[in-house]
Amino acid sequence: MAWPLLAPALLDWLSKPGAPDPPAWAQDLQGLAGEQPLPWWAAGFYQGQARHHLLRLRDNPRPAGLAPWIEGLLPQLEANLASRHRPGLVVPVPSWKRRANPLPALLAAALCRRLGWRLQPQLLRRSRPVLGQHHLGRELRMANQRGAFQAVAAPRGQLGPRPVVLLVDDILTTGATACAAAEALQQQHWRVVGLACLARTPARGRAGRDLTSDSRISDGPG
């Protein structure tokens, strides 16, 4: 099902009181933030039961399943982003696959509702296909994603400051995808303030693995 059909159901569910208590694994979604390779905010780490839940959610994107992630992410965004900027634009990172991952667009729509920012998916598109990168290291991912996006030019001559742009994706790994998307927008004179995502892949030393992942079969984590 296409994300425009799912987004209204998600937003309607999030606005209703009496949502069920989150599952036990959601207690680990305490919010994360970092500055490299670009400013980023995440609900939690991509590991354990949370990782398995995201994989299931990608195949069956239910509003109730996304809610714990949004609640884990929002405090970081409100403290570090929304309080410092006027309402800006939210751009989900697009997929080049015909059957696109629904989670970035669903998360972007939910964040717009909660933060009062505007959803603008049309600002960014894929300019070419890329290799599946779930077994690629950082340098190969950077090369794989370089030049893979094209952005709409920012309007010239408008009155007042141009709105900032927040990128949205489901998982942040090396940052190759996010950096390539941000570069395309910046080349068209948009100011990208960072990336909001559901989960951050643990660095080497956490769960005994580095920043590669075998979990996103079609696109691979960024």
Residue positions per predicted region:
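Glycine-rich phosphate/pyrophosphate-handling loop used in enzymes and phosphotransfer proteins
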Residues: M1-G222
